Amino acid sequence: IYPEEIVEAVCKLLNIRFDFPYKTVFIGANFQNLSIECVPNQVVRIDNLPSGHLILRMDYHFHEPNLVEQLKLNKCTIITDRPINKDILRAFKTQIVEVIYIIGDNHVPDFPEQIRRAGVPFRLVSYFNEEKLNPIKLHYFDAGLILPIINRVPDELKDLDSFYYKSCKFTLSEQKAFNSRYALKNGFAAKSLGDNWQTFNKNNPHAADFWYEIDNFQVLVDK
């Protein structure tokens, strides 16, 4: 049952008019779990993070000096598609929750071992499909499984050209907040963390990026 259905039922019992011109068609599995990411084109001070740590997107903007400054302020999970200087990993290992290494076209098979020697937990992930990933797996045999990052379109949304969505995940970049990678690439900044409704259009050139984060969204359409 969706939120507006509960409100409508309560209003009906109280004989109060309920006029809400939208209906929820999808709620992602992670929608109740607030998380904050930060692109290291800035250094931010955030206290009382919901998860207890910041997610640092070095894959969006690789900048080691800002990484160092951010680690001085917050514990971080680091997402990167490039190797990070091993001296940084060693110096800040108590501030690094884990490193998520994205295996891409310019992957470096030795990097997981450098992370391990620094005493930092890590995971391996990739946007590659199985056909492209299989020849690479042997290089990471001793490092562990490479988990796929899946681009998934829920059945409820396959036939929709556009809709409204709200997110529980925010990416901070250049002093602005974005409620998805789709919004970040389009420059669609959120008004606030609470008021972050945006419109999705499947013809947008960055539409494919939206589906990687679908579990973070609530989706509404006009009635």
Give the residues covered by each predicted segment.
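Leloir-type glycosyltransferase catalytic cores
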Residues: 1-38, 143-189
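Detector for Asparagine
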Residues: 15, 30-33, 41, 48, ...
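Non-catalytic interaction/regulatory modules that flank or connect domains
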Residues: 16-117
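Long, low-complexity regulatory tails in eukaryotic proteins
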Residues: 165-223
